[in-house]
Every structure is written in structure tokens, then in C-alpha cells.
């Protein structure tokens, strides 16, 4: 049986890379009269199900945009709740290595709490030899921020302006070596890419 109780048919060609903007959790909770935090918990649970299903059907790459650089502007209580949920998730994510899922985090880790950074590193190190799904989790990620990060890295390496190419910038992105997403899905139904 498939993810939604239907028989799986994976004989067709799969895309290589699907990206999901994990949004709409707060609106989902509000519609049900629940606190926003309940929406984030439900979203995290759904994410785990989706990641395992994508691994099962043989998808190569799944990227989830979990927390953008712009999300820091949300109320402190909500951000703290998301960070606590992230801690719990990262402790549980160690199970992914047993499922042959390779976990990688995208984004600027600098403003994150030390314990969260340590858990991220533990997950990456623990799953580095996995050969199944490449699961990219974007935390404190923004598309523009990623470009700035790449350019700063190039400048720090002392590469002259005349040697800077599109490929060089691409090679210095958080997403270096990955194919571009074939699909970007927003569960909220919005038709915008935000800062991803």
C-alpha cells in the first residue's frame, strides 16, 4: 500500500529532486481551533512520513524548507516552540540512518543554539554513508542569503573577480553538487517561492 492507502505504482520515471516548503501549519491549526504550535507538530509528523515514503519509492533527493531566515521575525514564543520541536526532531532523526537516509542541513547555522548545531552535525555524520534518499533540511535558509554566503566564501578564498563564474558560485552554494528541484510543493497552496 502507498502513502495514502492506494496501491503504489512507481514504474514510471520519478523526478530526481522534490522540494517542499513546509508552510501552512499555523493556518491548518487555526482552522481547527488549535494553537499554531499544534500545526508545527503536525507538520513535523507529516514530514517524517513523506521522507520515509520518498526513500521507499527510490527518490534521490528531497529538500524541505523548514525554517527560513525570515522566520526569525515571528513572535519569540513561536520561534522558541519551533526550535524546541527541531530539537526533538533531531533527536528522533537519528533513526533515519537505520533507514539508509542521508541527512544534510542547508543554511546558516551561526545563530542557532549550540545544542541544535551539535545535533545537526551528529545526524549528518551518522548518516553520511547512507545510499538511499538524500534528505536536505533547510534551516535558517534563504535563497538570497545562500548567494551572499557563496560570494563571501569565494572572496575569502582570494579568487579574483575575473575568475568568478556561474559554475564557481554554484560550487560554493549550500546546495553544491545537487540537481535543481524538479518540483517545489507548498502544502499551503500558495503560488510563491518566498525567499527560497
What are these regions (language model features)?
Residues 1-196:
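Flexible, compositionally biased loop and terminal segments
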Amino acid at each position: 500500500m502507498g502513502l495514502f492507502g492506494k496501491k503504489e505504482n512507481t514504474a514510471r520515471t520519478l523526478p530526481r529532486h522534490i522540494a517542499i516548503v513546509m508552510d501552512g501549519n499555523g493556518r491548518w491549526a487555526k482552522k481547527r481551533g488549535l494553537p499554531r504550535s499544534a500545526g508545527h507538530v503536525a507538520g513535523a509528523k507529516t514530514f517524517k512520513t513523506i521522507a520515509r515514503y520518498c526513500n521507499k519509492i527510490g527518490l534521490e533527493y528531497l529538500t524541505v524548507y523548514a525554517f527560513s531566515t525570515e522566520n526569525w521575525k515571528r513572535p519569540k514564543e513561536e520561534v522558541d516552540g519551533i526550535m524546541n520541536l527541531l530539537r526533538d526532531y533531531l533527536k528522533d532523526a537519528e533513526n533515519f540512518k537505520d533507514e539508509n537516509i542521508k541527512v544534510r542541513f542547508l543554511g546558516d547555522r551561526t545563530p542557532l543554539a549550540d545544542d541544535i548545531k551539535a545535533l545537526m552535525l551528529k545526524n549528518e555524520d551518522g548518516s553520511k554513508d547512507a545510499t538511499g534518499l538524500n534528505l536536505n533540511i533547510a534551516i535558517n535558509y534563504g535563497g538570497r542569503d545562500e548567494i551572499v554566503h557563496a560570494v563571501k566564501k569565494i572572496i575569502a578564498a582570494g579568487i579574483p573577480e575575473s575568475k568568478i563564474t556561474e559554475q564557481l558560485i554554484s560550487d560554493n552554494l549550500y546546495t553544491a553538487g545537487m540537481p535543481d528541484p524538479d518540483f517545489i510543493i507548498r502544502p499551503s497552496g500558495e503560488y510563491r517561492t518566498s525567499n527560497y
